[in-house]
From Swiss-Prot:
It is a peripheral membrane protein. GO terms for cellular component: plasma membrane. It is an enzyme of class 3 (hydrolase). GO terms for biological process: positive regulation of translation. This is Elongation factor 4. It comes from Ralstonia pickettii (strain 12J). Belongs to the TRAFAC class translation factor GTPase superfamily. Classic translation factor GTPase family. LepA subfamily. It catalyses: GTP + H2O = GDP + phosphate + H(+).
Length: 599
């Protein structure tokens, strides 16, 4: 037990944690040089392309330290992006230590702070590491100063390394062994193992990644999952080094995988405790994780109606690997049958869409993302509205509408403060705090979540040339003057185009959307009226002019009444068409709503 060290690597996006993980695996001989590839632990294509880590991965390594002992190191790689912070907290709760990787040329950024606080809350020993010291722009002393100022942990003896060249990586491991405590636990006690992650494998069913806290788990054991009460027979246990290696048993302090012939992921909940069947059952489950609540909702619809079942199966399969994705069936008059999906944030939403399109070949229409509003009705009931179409139709019944407010922490170099403050003000933010740390400035704002999901992140990156970083957490619901803007096409409401916006901004948004629709909707044989309305008040209107055939082409000279007759006849025909015709709304129209703000 004394020779085991469980640790994870936390850092801001692009500070080099996956590269450092690669070097550590190479140094410990986890993979031969031939099998070594960049970002070994990022196994999804999307992860490699975008250069981000989404799912936490593990590797059990053995390292011969300078004191001559061989240590078993369990590395758990974590994502750095704010949307996946729940993955980080899960990984950290299985560890005793964390390497806090800071890019020596960039200094401390938003996720560095957020993840580090998560680690400290969970009682994990944080070991600061300065990466990228080979860069000409590296300024390790300044980075150390920032770590101490902003996060408040002692970083005077922070290890310096370069994951790219490999220098200093051995020192990182030595610091890790010296500072991180060995796991506590009793291999002879009743079994308690925490499920850190679970995913679906086509051959063996559900694979669970567990951290054994007490007891010993062997193949052929009968185990009980405490949350569901279901019993299973363990078929195989083992560790990842990063390839899977079967072992006879996993004992207290170890991290490894368990395969028990479970068919669906619902049965193996992340955060659940595995124990033996009575009489050797553990008294109580381990404290799990808090359930993640989706923050952003959007409708996903198949482009072709007959793909609905396929979409449902794809979502079920995705949910096998992504416990935080939530979805329920939904019907829209404009788009037919589809699903209302809940995501952790915008990046999560993009990734789910991309995985559906890539891994399952789905063609999707996505509606504008919305957040959950609470509507207080006159009769005292509270309604949750996560879809603009569900907003109560009669405004006189509504007492108040509450919108979610988030606390946003922003970090940026001094010269961009003005631009960022202007952006936050535009987004109805109120400033809570502002502090200077060397050349970095930290701003704290309270901003409505609805403004963040539109395009806050993209705009923040563009006004700060990519230097600002942010992370946000939910604070509370507040009463707000928001209204629902409906889009009518030829007098018919298109439910999928409805948006909920603040009243001060509603006329502008209505006009913008109507103008955008006019560009996108193809011309028909009759005039198409596009209107934006709040309740019964139309706030904007655009017309798509009709295409017409020149019916007078065959008339040369002659009497005016002949021409009039032909024109009247054409007018009649157009009128009849307008009564029976329906307007096809192209896919771009639904995306246009998202892009209205960007001009």
């Amino acid at each position: 037990m004394d020779n085991i060290r469980n640790f994870s690597i936390i850092a801001h996006i692009d500070h080099g944690k996956s590269t450092l993980a690669d070097r550590i695996i190479q140094l410990c001989g986890g993979l031969s040089d031939r099998e070594m590839e960049a970002q070994v632990l990022d196994s999804m294509d999307i992860e490699k392309e975008r250069g981000i880590t989404i799912k936490a991965q593990t590797a059990a390594l053995s390292y011969k330290a300078r004191d001559g002992k061989v240590y078993n190191l369990n590395l758990i790689d974590t994502p750095g992006h704010v949307d996946f912070s729940y993955e980080v907290s899960r990984s950290l709760s299985a560890c005793e230590g964390a390497l806090l990787v800071v890019d020596a040329s960039q200094g401390v950024e938003a996720q560095t702070v957020a993840n580090c606080y998560t680690a400290i809350e969970l009682g994990v020993e944080v070991v600061p590491v300065l990466n990228k010291i080979d860069l000409p722009a590296a300024d390790p002393d300044n980075a150390i100063q920032e770590i101490e100022d902003v996060i408040g942990i002692d970083a005077a003896d922070a290890t310096r390394c370069s994951a790219k060249t490999g220098e200093g990586v051995a020192d990182v491991l030595e610091a890790l062994i010296a500072k991180v405590p060995a796991p506590k636990g009793d291999p002879a006690a009743p079994l308690q193992a925490l499920i850190i992650d679970s995913w679906f494998d086509n051959y063996v069913g559900v694979v669970m990644l567990v951290r054994v806290v007490n007891g010993t788990l062997r193949a052929k054991d009968k185990v009980l999952l405490m949350a569901t009460g279901a019993q299973h027979l363990v078929e195989q246990v083992g560790v990842f080094s990063p390839k899977s290696v079967p072992r006879e048993s996993l004992s207290a302090g170890q991290v490894g995988f368990v395969i028990a012939g479970i068919k669906e992921l619902k049965a193996a909940k992340v955060g659940d405790t595995i124990t033996h069947v009575a009489p050797r059952k553990a008294e109580a489950p381990l404290p799990g994780f808090k359930e993640v609540k989706p923050q952003v909702f959007a409708g996903l619809y198949p482009v072709e109606a007959n793909q609905y079942e396929a979409l449902r199966e794809s979502l079920e399969k995705l949910k096998l690997n992504d416990a935080s994705l939530q979805y329920e069936p939904e019907v829209s008059q404009a788009l037919g049958f589809g699903f209302r999906c809940g995501f952790l944030g915008l990046l999560h939403m993009e990734i789910v869409q991309e995985r559906l399109e890539r891994e399952f070949d789905m063609d999707l229409i996505t509606t504008a993302p919305t957040v959950v509003y609470q509507v207080q009705l006159r009769d005292g009931t509270m309604v949750q509205v996560e879809n603009p179409a569900k907003m109560p139709a009669d405004p006189s019944k509504i007492e108040a509408i509450l919108e979610p407010i988030v606390t946003v922490n922003l970090y940026m170099p001094q010269e961009y403060v003005g631009a960022v403050i202007t952006l936050c003000e535009q987004k109805r933010g109120s400033q809570i705090n502002m502090s200077y740390h060397g050349r970095q400035v930290q701003l704290t704002y309270e901003i409505p979540m609805g403004e963040i999901v539109l395009d806050f992140f993209d705009r923040l990156k563009s006004v700060s040339r990519g230097y600002a970083s942010m992370d946000y957490e939910f604070k509370e619901y507040r009463v707000s003057d928001v209204v629902k803007v409906d889009i009518l096409i030829n007098g018919d409401k298109v439910d999928a185009l409805s948006i909920i916006v603040h009243r001060s901004n509603s006329t502008y948004r209505g006009r913008e959307v109507a103008a955008k629709m006019r560009e996108i909707i193809p011309r028909q044989m009759y005039d198409v009226a596009i209107q934006a309305a709040i309740g019964a008040n139309v706030i904007a209107r655009e017309n798509v002019k009709a295409l017409r055939k020149n019916v007078l082409a065959k008339c040369y000279g002659g009497d005016i009444s002949r021409k009039k007759k032909l024109l009247e006849k054409q007018k009649e025909g157009k009128k009849r068409m307008k009564q029976v015709g329906t307007v096809e709304i192209p896919q771009e129209a639904f995306l246009a709503i998202l892009r209205v703000e960007e001009k």
